[in-house]
Each structure stands twice: as structure tokens, then as C-alpha cells.
Curated annotation (Swiss-Prot):
Its EC number is 7.5.2.7. Disulfide bonds: none annotated. ATP binds at G39, E40, N41, G42, A43, G44, K45, S46. This is Ribose import ATP-binding protein RbsA 2. Residues 7-242, 250-497 form the ABC transporter domain. It comes from Escherichia coli O157:H7. Signal peptide: none annotated. Pfam families: ABC_tran.
Length: 506
């Protein structure tokens, strides 16, 4: 690593009126380094990067490029310093070609005429350098999100950027697209580019970063090198408490009677005859590999999928569930794994999203009870600590963590007996995870039976009283007490060593 930093941000402060979003933050980045920037929502990560990119002007502090003071007051200043920030929302013109986007603001011209052919040739060279599969003449609107991201990177290379800032770049990418992006980022790092990578996804940070810096409440907490990366320490730095406090599943209440009892439930395809039981006040984990049938089993219970066999009991009574409406009437709530496509109404207000499942129940003679709806939404926002300026704010404008809590609040509002939670803390920062786990524990203390589907093994181990593991559409086994370990879960999930699988369930 080069001994001279390409970037130093010293004692950076940024005030909005009397509120300080940044309070004396330091950040040092070297050439040929992937430097991850972590912190909860509101920690100041994006604000710091906007100062670096010239979108905001620092209230105080100093920025050095190659060891020399450099004043950045505008985006043009940042570009002249070799800094490019790729925002979560792509800054591209969809109706223009890839080449036109790469050269936007710096078009080649001669005698007052734009040299489109030369722009296409130069743009294609940059695209080929990235290994991209599209052409410089393609319209941006025809590209995938991952390809549009490559256009942004190509534009940075065309501008000879030396510092590339990426803000949550994998948020809308598939696993394959994410893998390709990582390969590209590491190649740019090896070519000497400094990359600042903003993310709350620890797996990505572990895979990519050479160093990690953490912000909390607008202040610099510290940095860790790749050799010293530790999940527990990162969590402590981000939220101010150890990883063991994140789950806090000590609920100190006796488990009640069986609240949800599923007998040999099947759809004749993805889900083979499967049985499970969840008691009042219990959080039961449902683990397994992707494609094992976990989400499909929850959808059968909630009436989203049609069952071809089996039986469901709620509080000891056999029930027939043909639709989500029937499930809701029985006091069953279902948090879908895809909040944006299958859960939230992004263009509607937060309050409307919260009361979506209670409107029919609380209506008077077919008329909306607005006072009751407002009380429900206000109470839910307070209970779940949803950070919104007011209940009528558009759901699509909220952070991922607040969107997830908003969706959970919809099911809390029905006064549930049973909650089916599919990936309840996926895609949210550590602080939001902690609050979601707190809500789950509170609901369990009130006697709600919770079935939690999760692909995060620490979450399954940390939150579950018992764990069922699915494999190839069937329940492969059940784990209790000290047998709930990541190793035992993976043994059951993969089918490796079936003799051991039987041993850990006995």
C-alpha cells in the first residue's frame, strides 16, 4: 500500500442549522485500497461522502489530496480532484446512449460539431476495459441495473477518477451481478484506484475491504484492517454495544400451549408433507438452503399458495385457510421476504400501509373509521420507533430499516396470535436489526407465536427457542437448546452425514 494517502478528511463537520450531521470526522484512504465505510442509518456516511463529492460544503475541517490541501465546494471541484461518487439512485440520462452518458458534460467537438463517432470509439474502449457486455451505442434505458452501474464506473474511468465512492452498490443486484461487480472492483483496486465502499452488509465488507472505518452519530469511531476484522467488534463500534446484546432472547416467560400446529401440509410440489408446531410466546426458526421450500411453506399457512393436503390447527382448533383474508381473520400475520414488491405500497403514506390489514375490520357500515386508523398508525409508529417526520410521509421515501418496521407494524396492528416472518431483518442496518429483534421479543412476551424464516444463521441461533430445518421441500429435523448451532443447522440443511443429522435431533 502506498505510504502517502490519496485522500485525507480531517476534522470534518457539517451543520444544518443548529443540527450537526458530522462532528469532527476523520477519514484516510490510500491508493489501491478498498476502504469500507459502515454505520447505522443516520450515522453520517452519505453526508460525509456528499461533502467529499462537493454536493455539500463542510462547515469546518480540511480535505487533502495527495497530502496537499484541496478546497472542495462544488461537484466540479471534486471532479478536478479525481473524485467520483456513484449514488444509489443512478445519475444517468436513460434516453441517451451509453457513449453520450459517459461523455455527458465533456462532449468531444470540433468546429462546433459534436464528434459522435470518436465518442463511440473512445467509450467502447472504456467499456471493453470493464469487460461489459453492452455497446457504446446502446440506449441506457435498455440496460439492466448492473449494466447501468457499469456505465457509471466507465464514466469515472473516462474522467480519470482516482477515488471512486460507491453507496450501497449491490442493493438492487442479483447474486451473480454482485459477484461480477466485486470482480470489477477488485480489478480497479489492483490498478491503483482508491475505492470507498459504503455498505451495511457484513458479508460484502468481509469479502472486499482492505480496511473498514465506522461512523456513529456523526462521529468517527475507529478503523479496522482486514486482518483485524471481527463481526462482534464491528457491531460494537456501530451501535455501541456488543453482538451478544443484539438478540437478547431472554424472555423470562413460560411457553404456552400450541398456538400453530401444522400437520403434513403440502402443495404437492415445492412443499412435501411437512409438520411443525409453534407455542404461544415462542420464536421458532425455520432454516434451510435457498430453494428448500421455507417461504412456500409459510405461504401455504397464510393462504397465498393452495394446499393439496394436510391440516392446520390454531389454538387447538382445525382451520381451513383459502386466502390471506381468512388467515388475517384468524389472527395470522405474514411478513413477506420481498417488502418492496410483495409487501409495501411505496407510493402510499406510512399510515395507510400500517392500517392496510385492519381497514375492513375497523370500518363502520362500510365506511373508513379515520380516527381509529390514525390511532392505530400513531401507536404503531411509536411502538416500533419508526423514524418518520409524520404518518403521512410516502413509504417509498423511507430507509430500508424503517420500511421493514413499517411492514411489521401492519401485522402488529391486527393484534396477531401468530406471526410468520420471512427474512425479518434482511437488507437493514445493525441498528434496525436490533429494533426488529426487540419487537419480536416483545410480541413473544405477549404470547404471540412467531415462526421466523431466515438465511442468516447467527440470527436463527440467536433468536430461536427451537429450530426446524428444511431440505428439498421437507422438514429434515428439529433442533433444541444447546443443539441449536450453525454446524448442526448446516448438517441438516445439506444432508451431509445423515447419521449425525439423526443424532442431533434426538
Amino acid at each position: 500500500m502506498n505510504s502517502t494517502p490519496v485522500l485525507e478528511m480531517r476534522n470534518i463537520a457539517k451543520a444544518f442549522g443548529k443540527f450537526y450531521a458530522l462532528k469532527g470526522v476523520d477519514l484516510t484512504v490510500y491508493p489501491g485500497e478498498i476502504h469500507a465505510l459502515m454505520g447505522e442509518n443516520g450515522a453520517g456516511k452519505s453526508t460525509l461522502m456528499k461533502v467529499l463529492a462537493g454536493a455539500y460544503t463542510a462547515t469546518s475541517g480540511e480535505i487533502l489530496i495527495d497530502g496537499k490541501p484541496f478546497h472542495i465546494r462544488t461537484p466540479k471541484d471534486a471532479l478536478s480532484a479525481g473524485i467520483t461518487l456513484i449514488y444509489q439512485e443512478m445519475q444517468l440520462a436513460p434516453n441517451l446512449s451509453v457513449a453520450e452518458n459517459i461523455f455527458l458534460g465533456s462532449e468531444l467537438s470540433h468546429g462546433g460539431l459534436v464528434q459522435r463517432k470518436e465518442m463511440l470509439v473512445q467509450a467502447q474502449k472504456v467499456i471493453d476495459r470493464l469487460g461489459a457486455q453492452f455497446n457504446a451505442s446502446d440506449k441506457v434505458m435498455t440496460l439492466t441495473i448492473a449494466e447501468q452501474q457499469q456505465v457509471e464506473i466507465a464514466r469515472a474511468l473516462h474522467r480519470n477518477s482516482r477515488i471512486l465512492v460507491m453507496d450501497e452498490p449491490t442493493a438492487a443486484l442479483s447474486s451473480r451481478e454482485t459477484h461480477r461487480l466485486f470482480e470489477l472492483i477488485m480489478r480497479l483496486r489492483d490498478e491503483g484506484m482508491a475505492i470507498i465502499y459504503i455498505s451495511h452488509r457484513m458479508a460484502e465488507v468481509y469479502e472486499l475491504s482492505d480496511r473498514v472505518s465506522v461512523l456513529r452519530d456523526g462521529q468517527y469511531v475507529g478503523s479496522l484492517t482486514r486482518d483485524n476484522l471481527n463481526a462482534g467488534e464491528l457491531v460494537r463500534m456501530m451501535v455501541g454495544r456488543p453482538l451478544s446484546d443484539l438478540f437478547n432472547k431472554e424472555r423470562d416467560i413460560p411457553l404456552g400451549k400450541a398456538r400453530l400446529n401444522v400437520h403434513h401440509l403440502t402443495d404437492g410440489g415445492k412443499v412435501q408433507p411437512s409438520s411443525l408446531l409453534v407455542r404461544s410466546g415462542e420464536i421458532v426458526g425455520l432454516a434451510g438452503l435457498v430453494g428448500a421450500g421455507r417461504s412456500e411453506l409459510a405461504q401455504l399457512i397464510f393462504g397465498v399458495r393452495k394446499a393439496t393436503g394436510g391440516m392446520i390447527e390454531v389454538d387447538g382448533e382445525p382451520v381451513v385457510i383459502h386466502s390471506p383474508r381468512e388467515a388475517i381473520d384468524l389472527g395470522i400475520g405474514f411478513l413477506t421476504e420481498n417488502r418492496k414488491e410483495q409487501g409495501l405500497f411505496l407510493e402510499m403514506a406510512a399510515a395507510e400501509n400500517i392500517t392496510m390489514a385492519t381497514l375492513e375490520r375497523d370500518a363502520r357500515w362500510g365506511m373508513l373509521n379515520r380516527k381509529k386508523a390514525q390511532t392505530i398508525s400513531d401507536d404503531a409508529i411509536k411502538l416500533l420507533n419508526i423514524r418518520v417526520p409524520h404518518a403521512q410521509v410516502r413509504a417509498g421515501g423511507l430507509s430500508g430499516g424503517n420500511q421493514q418496521k413499517l411492514l411489521i407494524s401492519r401485522w402488529v396492528a391486527i393484534g396477531p396470535r401468530i406471526l410468520l416472518l420471512d427474512e425479518p431483518a434482511r437488507g437493514v442496518d445493525v441498528g434496525a436489526k436490533s429494533e426488529i429483534y426487540r419487537i419480536m421479543n416483545e410480541m413473544a412476551r405477549k404470547g404471540v407465536a412467531i415462526l421466523m424464516i431466515s438465511s442468516e444463521l447467527p440470527e436463527i441461533v440467536g433468536m430461536s427457542d427451537r429450530v426446524y430445518v428444511m431440505r428439498e421441500g421437507s422438514i429434515a429435523g428439529e433442533l433444541n437448546g444447546k443443539n441449536i448451532t450453525q454446524e448442526n443447522i448446516m448438517t441438516l440443511a445439506t444432508g451431509v452425514n445423515d447419521a449425525h443429522s439423526q443424532a442431533v435431533t434426538s
